[in-house]
């Protein structure tokens, strides 16, 4: 009697890569393979890599090396897989290498080295929504691949290609399956969410298709309207500041999607933004932020910035600090510029020293922590909707509409027993305390 083959799996990198991992795992289970969390008893190991910055490349190479040492039979996929020579130079014994979102190629290689079982005992166990690596109450929904921008600090287009939007009906069908399975929050991701469908012809964008018996158009605003009809939280990530983003704010004000906008602005100095090949009209950005908040006062704005970009002067950096003070963003991430092999910025003149990067990073964070603390303090005394993420002997932890999982803060809920609530439930919490990242409250 043949035994069911075991496949070990390692997933690294961002939420977009996690979605790719979920797709591969779903294919593996559908084909009858058993997924295990260890190398020891695996017939083969798949490593889904990240290659965005040098530290991610190093982490991926170390994971590949560990899998080879512990098991010996390894297939590599993901963003770093687009640089096959770099992997082969360090790990020549890797069996096969594919680039990102190469699901069919990965499965072809798996079948080559570990033939699919004749009898599939898992077919009936694969859920309609597929295998998910997130908790049952939230899921990432990827609406497109690739990116048409050529930011000088980034090599993603060279690994994931140009923008390729999924058909709107396909996206909505997946969203409905997730909602029907019990998912309470959808996190919309892509390399450039606001560019959804812009890679398609005007004819295709304006073409009427049908979903749930209703005629719809193929564009971001329609997509968000339809996602909002599912009756669950819908959160937008990686939103490039196109003009039509303004049209999303009324949907947030109406409660159709969460009042949360993740816009990676990267800097505030026009000179630095030009060198990055990013939009440079920072005054216009401030005007838009003011208008957005007038339309939707509950709007949470998250952004990310890079300090120490080549050529960044003290004057440029001060412009960034001044922007933080004026914009009063709610959630902010900051990265020190990291040279990436293949990125234009890596070869630019006037590289900033590591000491200066570190010093500017800490100054940046001091300013933003003060701003974030003040904005969270304004929530004390208010009652917020909170989705429960964790319940254990130490208490209950959830997130408000202003908090995305893993990257934002949390809400610690007191005076509530684990018998009274369950993970994924949305409850009302009265906020009693705040710091620069998190909130505390009671029911």
Swiss-Prot record:
Q: Which residues form the MTTase N-terminal domain?
A: 5-115
Q: Which reaction does it catalyse?
A: L-aspartate(89)-[ribosomal protein uS12]-hydrogen + (sulfur carrier)-SH + AH2 + 2 S-adenosyl-L-methionine = 3-methylsulfanyl-L-aspartate(89)-[ribosomal protein uS12]-hydrogen + (sulfur carrier)-H + 5'-deoxyadenosine + L-methionine + A + S-adenosyl-L-homocysteine + 2 H(+)
Where does the record place the TRAM domain? 377-443
Which residues are involved in binding [4Fe-4S] cluster 2?
147, 151, 154
The answer, when asked if 4Fe-4S is one of the entry's keywords, is yes
Cofactor list: [4Fe-4S] cluster
**What general EC class does the enzyme of this chain belong to?**
transferase
Gene Ontology CC entries for this record: cytosol
Which part of the chain is the Radical SAM core domain? 133-374
Question: How many and how are cofactors bound here?
Answer: Binds 2 [4Fe-4S] clusters. One cluster is coordinated with 3 cysteines and an exchangeable S-adenosyl-L-methionine.
Q: Which GO terms describe its biological process?
A: tRNA modification
For this chain, one GO molecular function annotation is: 4 iron, 4 sulfur cluster binding
Location(s), subcellular: Cytoplasm
Instruction: Quote the record's binding site residues for [4Fe-4S] cluster 1.
Output: 14, 50, 79
Keyword Iron attached: yes
Give the Enzyme Commission number: 2.8.4.4
Q: Name the domain of life this protein comes from.
A: Bacteria
- State the UniProt keywords alphabetically: 4Fe-4S, Cytoplasm, Iron, Iron-sulfur, Metal-binding, S-adenosyl-L-methionine, Transferase
Which InterPro entries did the record assign?
Elp3/MiaA/NifB-like_rSAM, Methylthiotransferase, Methylthiotransferase_CS, Methylthiotransferase_N, Methylthiotransferase_N_sf, NA-bd_OB-fold, Ribosomal_uS12_MeSTrfase_RimO, rSAM
Please describe what this protein does: Catalyzes the methylthiolation of an aspartic acid residue of ribosomal protein uS12.
Family of the protein in this entry: Belongs to the methylthiotransferase family. RimO subfamily.
What PANTHER family does this protein map onto? RIBOSOMAL PROTEIN S12 METHYLTHIOTRANSFERASE RIMO, RIBOSOMAL PROTEIN US12 METHYLTHIOTRANSFERASE RIMO
Question: How is this protein named in the record?
Answer: Ribosomal protein uS12 methylthiotransferase RimO
């Amino acid at each position: 009697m043949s035994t069911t083959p075991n496949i070990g799996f390692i997933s690294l990198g961002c939420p977009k890569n996690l979605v790719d991992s979920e797709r591969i795992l779903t294919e593996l289970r559908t084909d009858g393979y058993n997924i295990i969390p260890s190398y020891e008893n695996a017939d083969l190991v798949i490593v889904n890599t990240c290659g965005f910055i040098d530290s991610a490349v190093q982490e991926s190479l170390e994971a590949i090396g560990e899998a080879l040492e512990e098991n010996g039979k390894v297939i590599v996929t993901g963003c770093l897989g687009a640089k096959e020579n770099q992997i082969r130079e360090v790990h020549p014994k890797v069996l096969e290498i594919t680039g990102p979102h190469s699901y069919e190629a990965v499965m072809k290689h798996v079948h080559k080295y570990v033939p699919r079982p004749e009898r599939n005992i898992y077919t009936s166990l694969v859920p309609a929504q597929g295998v998910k690596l997130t908790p049952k109450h939230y899921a990432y929904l990827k609406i497109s691949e690739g990116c048409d921008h050529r930011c000088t600090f980034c090599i993603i287009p060279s690994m994931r290609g140009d923008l390729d939007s999924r058909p709107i009906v396909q996206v909505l069908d997946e969203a409905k399956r997730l909602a029907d399975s019990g998912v309470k929050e959808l996190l919309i991701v892509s390399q450039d969410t606001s560019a959804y469908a812009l890679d398609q012809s005007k004819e295709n964008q304006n073409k009427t298709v049908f979903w749930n018996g209703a005629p719809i158009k193929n564009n971001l605003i329609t997509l968000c309207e339809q996602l909002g009809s599912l009756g669950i939280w819908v959160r937008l990530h990686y939103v490039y500041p196109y003009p039509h983003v303004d049209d999303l704010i009324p949907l947030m004000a109406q409660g159709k999607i969460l009042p949360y906008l993740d816009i990676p602005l990267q800097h505030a100095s026009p000179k630095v933004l030009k060198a990055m090949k990013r939009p440079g009209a920072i005054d216009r950005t401030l005007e838009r932020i003011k208008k957005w908040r007038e339309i939707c006062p509950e709007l949470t704005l998250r952004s990310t910035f890079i300090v120490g970009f080549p050529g960044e002067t003290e004057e440029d950096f001060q412009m960034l600090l001044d922007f933080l003070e004026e914009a009063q963003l709610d959630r902010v991430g900051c990265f020190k510029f990291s040279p990436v092999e293949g990125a234009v910025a890596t070869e630019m003149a006037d590289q900033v020293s590591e000491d200066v990067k570190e010093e500017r990073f800490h100054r940046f964070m001091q300013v933003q922590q003060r701003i974030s603390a003040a904005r969270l303090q304004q929530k004390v005394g208010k009652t917020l909707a909170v989705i429960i993420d964790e319940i254990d002997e130490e208490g209950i932890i959830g997130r408000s509409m202003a908090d995305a999982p893993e990257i934002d803060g949390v809400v610690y809920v007191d005076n509530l027993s684990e018998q009274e609530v369950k993970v994924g439930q949305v409850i009302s919490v009265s906020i009693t305390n705040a710091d620069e990242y998190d909130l505390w409250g009671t029911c």
